Amino acid sequence: TSSCFRQAAEEYGYKAQNFIIYPIKVNQMRPVVEEIISHGKKFNLGLEAGSKPELHAVIAINSDSDSLIICNGYKDESYIELALLAQKMGKRIFLVVEKMNELKLIAKMAKQLNVMPNIGIRIKLASSGSGKWEDSGGDASKFGLSSSELLEALDFLESKGLKDCLKLIHFHIGSQVTKIRRIKTALREASQFYVQLHAMGFKVEFVDIGGGLGVDYD
């Protein structure tokens, strides 16, 4: 996969860094994750946690302070606190907001712990994938912020002095996508969000692309 991406990057003149993120929910067995981390170092491999227990596992396994840790899933105060404490210890960790109340909790906990959090926002795109799981992405998804909610989040960040903390935008167009055209459409839409956010003074550094190509497992 990495060699294919490298070839495509050369063909289309893509110059930016790219990172591979492994969600440990796929397989949490320590020997498996350690092997993936070891092999993936040269490919900028990071890990994704979808819960507080998974984040505990990621912190314990991943000793590389340069690799990315992405925090998704439902976030209560204890999950957010663990992520922020890990950041204070030098971990390169990002909390991806899926609901407005999560953003307010992050701001509250960050103030208590005296840390400037690395914040990501999951955006609901109008575009969606295709196939069996298309409703898990796009504006039909129950996860992520709509355009109006995104504006509310941006106003909130600015009011709390956290404008510079928005480092990442995330979108998910669904699993088992059967039409490459849907992915292209979603990427164009996401790039517009990226450009507009920069124009508004939010210096987003990462675009986290979620979803997967259709694979015939039968």
Residues of each region from the PLM?
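Low-complexity, highly charged intrinsically disordered N-terminal segments
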Residues: 1-13, 23
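Structured binding elements
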Residues: 209
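A short, charged/proline- and glycine-enriched loop
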Residues: 15-17
